[in-house]
Amino acid sequence: MTSKTIKRCAFMVAALLFTMSSFAQLRLPAGYYWKQLPNGLQVVVIENSKVPLATVQIAVKNGSFTEDSVYNGLSHMFEHMFFKANKDYPTQAQFLKRTQELGAIWNGTTGYERVNYFFTFDTDSLNAGLKFLNAAIRFPIYRIEDMEKERKVVDGEFQRAESDPGFQLNFEVEKRVWGDLFTRKNPIGIHDIINTATPEKMMVIKNKYYFPNNSLLIICGDVHHESAFTLAENIFGDWASSGSDPILKYPIPPFKPLVKNDIFIKESTIAKTPYMMFEWQGPSYATDSASTIAADVFSTIVTLNSSKLQQALVDKGLATNVSVGYLTCKYTGPIQIFIVPNPNKLKECYAELLNQISMWNNPDYYTDDQLKDAKGILLRNDIMAKEKPSSLPSQISFMWCSTSLNYYTDNTDDYQKVTRADIKKYLDTYLINKPFVGGLIISPDLNKTVNAASFFAAK
């Protein structure tokens, strides 16, 4: 045996041991079962017999976080083309006929860090449904005529979104928050890229990311995990691994931190009601998972009707709605405040928001009871979210793509463990005196009256 062969064997053993140790402490809720196939495909089976249905979903670590300006929006286009044609059903008419035969409800979504596809049908159709999913994910057919039709559909989604002033404001804020890497936080894409998408570009995406070792298969519903694992292995077991982690092979560049506040005003004739939006670069699961938990708890506190933020803005008539949220991401999640201000009190609303933010880190900004109430809301929200079996696969696949299965399992318990010190660390690290982007969208007529530039500016 040569030294090169010995080194290769040693590397393979080390990799195997690392994989085994990575999953040795895997935690899942009761009724959830996990298995990794030899090709790297992870399979989660969720036994839930509330109704005689099964939902199958496959999630891929793909989405806008993998896209540069040449491919922006094409993960979304790829998702649409998934439902067109494949080796077993070579036309969309045949594909759709098969969904009707299965009695399937189906859809897909594309986000920052996940693309997922799912079908729900009678439990008796599980074997046939998994074969149908297998054909679509592994053996797609991309025809120019199909793509020409779907370009219009995908771009139509974009154009409809642009008719919403809230989308217009969000789009401009995001461009400024993420700078040169905006495309990696822009799942909807770029018009020109969508309208010139080709089969060749679809195959580039497929050959980069659509491998079993970059995917999670979830089988949920009135099923038994042992037989479901057997079906998964029989149907997906010969799907060839890429041989390496695609996310490591095609590294994701880090986002550049904001260096100063960026405040802008956007006039739009469709903005019948003005909106304000503010965004910070928040925590990343990969580097600060604890703060992703604290972020959700704090956001819930300040959206309580009893919170100082709501009382200062909504109860005092400065705004009709104030929402605060953080989106968990592996690669830098956004922290957002969205406000529907009183058109007659825009200056006062903006000034009071800044005043409230400056006080967020004061020990008396929220009470122990409000902290307890926020944790209770998060617990109840989790219970309600898990009432519908067909929604469970999307919940766990989102976490698998952006965090981990353990994070999903522990999430609700971890909310209950959040302390004031955890929240203070989150606020100090990401919000208090940290640069942000702020935007106001307003109609030209209203702006003539209020002269927003005289007060809506960096301070």
PLM features: residue spans?
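Bacterial N-terminal signal peptides that target proteins for export
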Residues: M1-V13
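Proteolytic maturation boundary segments
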Residues: C9-M12, S22-V45, H224-S268, P274-Y275, ...
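M16 family metallopeptidases and their MPP-like homologs
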Residues: I46, V51-S69, G73-M77, T91-A136, ...
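Catalytic Zn2+-binding segment of zinc metalloproteases
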Residues: M81-K87
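Non-catalytic, conformational "gating/processing" segments within enzyme and secreted inhibitor domains
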Residues: R151, P199-I235, P435
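His/Glu-based metal-binding/catalytic segments typifying zinc-dependent metallopeptidases
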Residues: S244-S306, F338
